[in-house]
Amino acid sequence: MGLSDGEWHLVLNVWGKWETDLAGHGQEVLIRLFKSHPETLEKFDKFKHLKSEDDMRRSFDLRKHGNTVLTALGGILKKKGHHEAELKPLAQSHATKHKIPIKYLEFISEAIIHVLHSKHPAEFGADAQAAMKKALELFRNDIAAKIKELGFHG
């Protein structure tokens, strides 16, 4: 299920566009996630009080967390599937500390695809979207396996 060199090129090319504003794009991804799947907000104690989209847009902490999420994901994507070392601590924290259901990884992947397309439509055509979906699926499958190894099946 790995990606070809051409697919990785498409993924990393559009990712390069995002790196100019990881905090802003990350905040947009989290807003999209919370609006599309309000139940996900309950897993974030420090964001539960953000009831409206305006509250979310004004939140420095949400922007900061968006940066953290996309920085970690970017580091994983740049490994082109050789991300074992990066996944272990991420799986550990998501399974034991945050207890994030595996299904939520699919939800955030959908949000990433949506925001990428809305922000960079020229660079994120059908081929790039397909490649990114494949890369995110690879990430999700690998981290889900690690999370399950830790005994968390949420």
UniProtKB/Swiss-Prot annotation:
**PROSITE patterns according to UniProt:** GLOBIN
| Disulfide bridge map | none
Domain (Globin): give its ranges: 2-148
UniProt-annotated binding residues for heme b: 94
Residues that bind O2, according to the entry?
65
Main location per the UniProt record: cytoplasm
Does this entry carry the keyword Iron? yes
Q: Where in the cell is it found?
A: Cytoplasm, Sarcoplasm
One GO BP: removal of superoxide radicals
Enzyme class, spelled out? oxidoreductase
Provide the positions where the record notes the PTM Phosphothreonine.
68
Q: Which GO terms describe its molecular function?
A: heme binding; metal ion binding; nitrite reductase activity; oxygen binding; oxygen carrier activity; peroxidase activity
Q: Binding positions for nitrite?
A: 65
What keywords does the record list, in alphabetical order? Cytoplasm, Heme, Iron, Metal-binding, Muscle protein, Oxidoreductase, Oxygen transport, Phosphoprotein, Transport
Signal peptide positions are: none
Q: Does the keyword Oxidoreductase apply?
A: yes
This entry's Enzyme Commission designation comes to: 1.7.-.-, 1.11.1.-
One GO cellular component term of this record is:
extracellular exosome
Q: Which family does it belong to?
A: Belongs to the globin family.
Quaternary assembly: Monomeric.
Q: What does this protein do?
A: Monomeric heme protein which primary function is to store oxygen and facilitate its diffusion within muscle tissues. Reversibly binds oxygen through a pentacoordinated heme iron and enables its timely and efficient release as needed during periods of heightened demand. Depending on the oxidative conditions of tissues and cells, and in addition to its ability to bind oxygen, it also has a nitrite reductase activity whereby it regulates the production of bioactive nitric oxide.
Q: What is this protein called?
A: Myoglobin
The protein's organism comes out as Pusa sibirica (Baikal seal)
Lineage from the top down? Eukaryota, Metazoa, Chordata, Craniata, Vertebrata
